[in-house]
C-alpha cells in the first residue's frame, strides 16, 4: 500500500482507477478517526514523487510494482477516479475533511478514552472532578468580574444629584400636603378627581425613578467614589431607606376598586419619602449664600404644614361628630355661607392657628373627645412652637452677631478717643473709616476666617484671589511658582481713607504695596501738587524691600504717596519677602539683578559700590550678630552651670540629712543582730 500513490505531476493524465485492498477496513478506520491506508507513509510517498520528478522513466513504476506483487486479490475492488482524488497531493485523508468533523472526532476520542481510563483508574476520576470544580470556580470568578463592571455613577456632591433632589422633593411635598387634605375634604377629592389621579401617578413614576437613581448614586470608600454596580445596589439594599422606599410604592391604589374613589387616605404610605425632602433642604442650606434667611423660611414652612395638618384633623373630627351639633365643631354646612369648600378650609386653618399658637379665642369644647383633642393640640403647640421660636431667635441673634461685634469695636474706639481728648475732626475720620468698612463688607478678618482650612486649600484660595495681582509686579514676573505661592500667602490687605499718606519721602522702606482698588497720587512736599495718579494694579516700593547695594536712595522712600479716596492695598513686608527667599536663593539673586537693572535705567545705582563685592557694612552687621549670639550662648551656659551647681549642693545636703536620720536606726539593727550571737559564743563547726 505504500506505493499506491497517484502521480499528479502530469496535467494531461486522466483520472485513473486505483485498486484499494480491503476497502471496508479502510472506511471503518476513517470513520474511527484513524489514519487511512491511502497515506500510511507520507514520507515514502513524497520520496517517490521526488524520484518521479527527477526520472521521467519512473512514471510507470506504480503499475509495474503493483503487478510485481502479484496483482489484485479476490477482495480487491476497483474504485472510480472520483474516490481516487481522495489521496491527491500526497496528503492524508484527514487533512481533506472539514475542521468541524476533525473536532468532533477528537472529542469522541477523548470521551471514549476518558471513559476507559475512568473505569480503570479511580484516581483519574478524582482528578477529573477537581479539574471540573476548578473550571466552575473560574467561571464563577469571571461572572463576578463581569458583575463588578463600572456603571455611570451620580456624584452625591455634584449639581446633577442636587437637581434631582429638587425634582423628587416636589412630589414629596405634594403628597405631604394634599393627601391629608383630600382625605378630610370630600369635595376637594371628588371635584378634581382626574387631576389628582394624574398627579398621583406622575409622582409614583418619579418615586420609581428615584429608586433607580439611588442605585446609581456613588459613595466614598477610602476617599474614592465607588462605581461598581453590585456594591452600589448592595449599599442601597442594606439601608433602611430602601425598605421605606419599597413601602412607599406598595400599590395601595388597588383598594380604590373595592372602597371607591373617595378614600385617598390609602395613599398615606407615599409620605415615607420624607428623607429626600429633608436632604434637599440640608444641601440647600450649605449651598446658599444666605443660610440664615433659608433657615427661617424653612421653619416657617414647617409651621404652616403642622397648622395645615391640624386644620384637616379638626374638620374630620367635626364631620365625625356632626356639623353644627355644638358650638365647638364646624358650623352646619347646609348654611350657604359655610357650605363652600374655600370657607371650610379657611375656617379650619384659622381655628388650627389660634389653637396651636396658644392664643385661644376659640369656642370652648363641649364633648369629652373635643376636650382631649384640644388638650393634645395645646401640648403640641407648646412643644413645637417653643423649639421653633427658640431656633428663630438664635438665628436672628446670629445674623446680628457680626453687626454687634463691629459696633462694640466702634464704641470702644469712641471711648478711647474721648478719654484721650482726640480732636473732633480725627474722630469723624475714624468713624467714616469704620462706616466705609461696614458698608463695603470689608470687616472680615481673612486670617481668622481661613485659619480653619488646611494649608493647601488656604493656598489655593490665596492664589485665586492674589496671584494675578502679584504677577503684575515687574520683579516677580519670571519668578518660580513656588515662590509666588509663598508670597501670595504673606500679602496683607490694608484700607486707607481719603487724605492718608501711604509713605513719605525719606521714610525707611519696609513694605511694598499693590493697589487692589482705589486711586493714589504721587504728590509734592506741600501735599497738594499731584505728579502722577496710580490706579488699580499699580505697585510701588518693590526696590526698597530688596535692599540692593549701590542704591543712591539707600533704603528710603523717594516720593510722597497719598490716597485720594478710599483705597484697598495689598502689603508685602521686607521680612516676609526675605523669609520666603531663604528657600529660593536663585530667585533672590535674580530679583537683585532685576532691581539693579531698574535702578540703572533710572540712574539711581552706583556701579562701583554694586560691583565692589560684599558690603563691609553687611560684614560688620554679621559680626555683631555673631558676637551677640555668642554672648547669649555664654550667658545661657553660665546660667545652666549655676543651676547645676546649686542642684548638686542641694543633693549633698539631702544626702547628709538622710545619713543622719538612718545612722541610729542602722546602729540599733546591728546591735540587735550581734547581741544574741555574742551570748551564744562561737559555734563548733565539727
From Swiss-Prot:
Keywords in alphabetical order: Calcium, Calcium channel, Calcium transport, cAMP, cAMP-binding, Cell membrane, cGMP, cGMP-binding, Coiled coil, Disease variant, Glycoprotein, Ion channel, Ion transport, Ligand-gated ion channel, Membrane, Nucleotide-binding, Retinitis pigmentosa, Sensory transduction, Sodium, Sodium channel, Sodium transport, Transmembrane, Transmembrane helix, Transport, Vision
Coiled-coil residue windows: 619-673
Tissues in which the UniProt entry reports expression: Rod cells in the retina.
Membrane-side (Extracellular) residue stretches: 188-197, 263-267, 318-340
Biased composition (Acidic residues): 39-53
UniProt-annotated binding residues for 3',5'-cyclic GMP: 541, 544, 557-558
Region (Selectivity filter), start-end ranges: 358-361
UniProt site (Central gate): 385, 389
Region described as C-linker: 401-477
Region (Cyclic nucleotide-binding domain): 481-601
Transmembrane segments: 166-187, 198-218, 244-262, 268-286, 294-317, 341-375, 376-400
Region of interest called Disordered, as start-end residue ranges on this chain: 31-75, 87-149
Glycan-linked positions: 325
GO MF, one example: protein-containing complex binding
SMART domains (alphabetical): cNMP
Keyword Protein biosynthesis among record annotations: no
Reactions performed catalytically: Ca(2+)(in) = Ca(2+)(out); Na(+)(in) = Na(+)(out); K(+)(in) = K(+)(out); NH4(+)(in) = NH4(+)(out)
Function field: Pore-forming subunit of the rod cyclic nucleotide-gated channel. Mediates rod photoresponses at dim light converting transient changes in intracellular cGMP levels into electrical signals. In the dark, cGMP levels are high and keep the channel open enabling a steady inward current carried by Na(+) and Ca(2+) ions that leads to membrane depolarization and neurotransmitter release from synaptic terminals.
Entry's free-text remark on domains: The C-terminal coiled-coil domain mediates homotrimerization of CNGA1 subunit. The cyclic nucleotide-binding domain (CNBD) comprises three helices and a beta-roll of eight beta-strands from CNGA1 and CNGB1 subunits. Upon cNMP binding transmits the conformational changes to the C-linker domain of the S6 helix to open the ion conduction pathway.
UniProt similarity note: Belongs to the cyclic nucleotide-gated cation channel (TC 1.A.1.5) family. CNGA1 subfamily.
Name of the protein this chain belongs to: Cyclic nucleotide-gated channel alpha-1
Originating species: Homo sapiens (Human)
Amino acid at each position: 500500500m505504500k506505493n499506491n500513490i497517484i502521480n499528479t505531476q502530469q496535467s494531461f493524465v486522466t483520472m485513473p482507477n486505483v485498486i484499494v485492498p480491503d476497502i471496508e477496513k479502510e472506511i471503518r478506520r476513517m470513520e474511527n478517526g484513524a489514519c487511512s491506508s491511502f497515506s500510511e507513509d507520507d514520507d515514502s510517498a513524497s520520496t517517490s514523487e521526488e524520484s518521479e520528478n527527477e526520472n521521467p522513466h519512473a512514471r510507470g513504476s506504480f503499475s509495474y510494482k503493483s503487478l510485481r506483487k502479484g496483482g489484485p486479490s479476490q477482495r480487491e475492488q476497483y474504485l472510480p477516479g472520483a474516490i481516487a482524488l481522495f489521496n491527491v497531493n500526497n496528503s492524508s485523508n484527514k487533512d481533506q475533511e472539514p475542521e468541524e468533523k476533525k473536532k468532533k472526532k477528537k472529542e469522541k476520542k477523548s470521551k471514549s478514552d476518558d471513559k476507559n481510563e475512568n473505569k480503570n483508574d479511580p484516581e483519574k476520576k478524582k482528578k477529573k472532578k477537581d479539574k471540573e470544580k476548578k473550571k466552575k470556580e473560574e467561571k464563577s470568578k469571571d461572572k463576578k468580574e463581569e458583575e463588578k463592571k463600572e456603571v455611570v455613577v451620580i456624584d452625591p456632591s455634584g449639581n446633577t444629584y442636587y437637581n434631582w433632589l429638587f425634582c423628587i422633593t416636589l412630589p414629596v411635598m405634594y403628597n405631604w400636603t394634599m393627601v391629608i387634605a383630600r382625605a378630610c375634604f370630600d369635595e376637594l377629592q371628588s371635584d378634581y378627581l382626574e387631576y389628582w389621579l394624574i398627579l398621583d401617578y406622575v409622582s409614583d413614576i418619579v418615586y420609581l425613578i428615584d429608586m433607580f437613581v439611588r442605585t446609581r448614586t456613588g459613595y466614598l470608600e477610602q476617599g474614592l467614589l465607588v462605581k461598581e454596580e453590585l456594591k452600589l445596589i448592595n449599599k442601597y439594599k442594606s439601608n433602611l431607606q430602601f425598605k421605606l422606599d419599597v413601602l412607599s410604592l406598595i400599590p395601595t391604589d388597588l383598594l380604590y376598586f373595592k372602597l371607591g374613589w373617595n378614600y385617598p387616605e390609602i395613599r398615606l404610605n407615599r409620605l415615607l419619602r420624607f428623607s429626600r425632602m429633608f436632604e434637599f433642604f440640608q444641601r440647600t442650606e450649605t449651598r446658599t449664600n444666605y443660610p440664615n434667611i433659608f433657615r427661617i423660611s424653612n421653619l416657617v414652612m414647617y409651621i404652616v404644614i403642622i397648622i395645615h395638618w391640624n386644620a384637616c384633623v379638626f374638620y374630620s373630627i367635626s364631620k365625625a361628630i356632626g356639623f353644627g351639633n355644638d358650638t365647638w365643631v364646624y358650623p352646619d354646612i347646609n348654611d350657604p355661607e359655610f357650605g363652600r369648600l374655600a370657607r371650610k378650609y379657611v375656617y379650619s386653618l384659622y381655628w388650627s392657628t389660634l389653637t396651636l399658637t396658644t392664643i385661644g379665642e376659640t369656642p370652648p369644647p363641649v364633648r369629652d373627645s373635643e376636650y382631649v383633642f384640644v388638650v393634645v393640640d395645646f401640648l403640641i403647640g407648646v412643644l413645637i412652637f417653643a423649639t421653633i421660636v427658640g431656633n428663630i431667635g438664635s438665628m436672628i441673634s446670629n445674623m446680628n452677631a457680626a453687626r454687634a461685634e463691629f459696633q462694640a469695636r466702634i464704641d470702644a474706639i469712641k471711648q478711647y478717643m474721648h478719654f484721650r481728648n482726640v480732636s473732633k475732626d480725627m474722630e469723624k475720620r475714624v468713624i467714616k473709616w469704620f462706616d466705609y468698612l461696614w458698608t463695603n463688607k470689608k470687616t472680615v478678618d481673612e486670617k481668622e476666617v481661613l485659619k480653619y482650612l488646611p494649608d493647601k486649600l488656604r493656598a489655593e484660595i490665596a492664589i485665586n484671589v492674589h496671584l494675578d495681582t502679584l504677577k503684575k509686579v515687574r520683579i516677580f514676573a519670571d519668578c518660580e511658582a513656588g515662590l509666588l505661592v509663598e508670597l501670595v500667602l504673606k500679602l496683607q490687605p490694608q484700607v486707607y481713607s481719603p487724605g492718608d499718606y501711604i509713605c513719605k519721602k525719606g521714610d525707611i522702606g519696609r513694605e511694598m504695596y499693590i493697589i487692589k482698588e482705589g486711586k493714589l497720587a504721587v504728590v509734592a512736599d506741600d501735599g497738594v501738587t499731584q505728579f502722577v495718579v496710580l490706579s488699580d494694579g499699580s505697585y510701588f516700593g518693590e526696590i526698597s524691600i530688596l535692599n540692593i547695594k549701590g542704591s543712591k536712595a539707600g533704603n528710603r522712600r523717594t516720593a510722597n504717596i497719598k490716597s485720594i479716596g478710599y483705597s484697598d492695598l495689598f502689603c508685602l513686608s521686607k521680612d516676609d519677602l526675605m523669609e520666603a527667599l531663604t528657600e529660593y536663593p536663585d530667585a533672590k539673586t535674580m530679583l537683585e539683578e532685576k532691581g539693579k537693572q531698574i535702578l540703572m535705567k533710572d540712574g539711581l545705582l552706583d556701579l562701583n559700590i554694586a560691583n565692589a563685592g560684599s558690603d563691609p557694612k553687611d560684614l560688620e552687621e554679621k559680626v555683631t550678630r555673631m558676637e551677640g549670639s555668642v554672648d547669649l550662648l555664654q550667658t545661657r551656659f553660665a546660667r545652666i552651670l549655676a543651676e547645676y551647681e546649686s542642684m548638686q549642693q542641694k543633693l549633698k545636703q539631702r544626702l547628709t540629712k538622710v545619713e543622719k536620720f538612718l545612722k541610729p536606726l542602722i546602729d540599733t539593727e546591728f546591735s540587735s543582730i550581734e547581741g544574741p550571737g555574742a551570748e551564744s559564743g562561737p559555734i563548733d563547726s565539727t
